[in-house]
Amino acid sequence: MATPLLATKLFAPPPPLRAMKRQRLMQRLDAGLEGKLTLVCAPAGFGKSTVLGTWVQACEQPSAWLSLDEGDRDPNQFAAYLTASLRSVSADLGDGALALAQARPGPPPETVLIHLINRLAMRRGRLVLVLDDYQFASGPEVDALLAFLIDNQPAPLHLIVISREVPAIPLARLRSRGQVLDLGPQDLRFAAEETRLFLNQSMALGLTDPQIQALDARTEGWPAGLQMAAVSLARQSDADSFIRSFTGSHGLAQDYLLEEVLNRL
């Protein structure tokens, strides 16, 4: 009997309340579709999934999403979920491949990928596949499968990999051909104008320019830091005092960082 697949892994996470559409990044992601791969790598709290989820919602191209976890280090499970995510866009893409991926004993997972690659190669329109939280699935076997997919990537497919760490896959050749869009921490940090729009438009805090500049400097544009500061500021009567005291040792920031550390253990 085939192991059931969790359907919720096949949908982009809902955007946070009052999430801001970051037009600068939306435009870069649109332009990245001209290449084969978009690689979004940054530590926790940089809003990677939020940015990509917002972009996918507005993307005119059919888009498949797969949220990965530690269980997907099993190459057969990875291949099964990869197939299911593509089937969520077009059932014919995974026609027969899902049964192969879930068969026990089954063929090597590369066989499943070959089936998918061949079906994708016959597709007329472009398709986007997003692999979120790739760091959880990363390992020698799954990295080899991803490298195989990239090496044999059919023209209609644009692949987006979201990870806290740079995947151990060979990308030099694609980069030399201008086929990779790289988005890292510096790209994902809030620019000064984005900070202003987030605090005073999305969060409706009504801060002065000096207050915004001070908070931007203290968080260094870190999206999670700004989010935590904004939530706390909404409950403060003295914004200036709070901003002066807000650092990485602030209670909410400590809770966030502690949770991230525990999740890595």
Predicted segments with their positions:
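P-loop (Walker A) phosphate-binding loop of NTP-binding proteins
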Residues: 43
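Conserved small helical "lid"/interfacial subdomain of P-loop NTPases
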Residues: 185-211
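Conserved nucleotide-binding/hydrolysis micro-motifs of P-loop NTPases
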Residues: 70-73, 136, 165-168, 188-189
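Conserved adenine-nucleotide phosphate-binding loops and their immediately adjacent elements
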Residues: 1-29, 95-101, 192, 197
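Generic structural signal for small/hydrophobic residues in well-ordered secondary structure
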Residues: 22, 49, 82, 132, ...
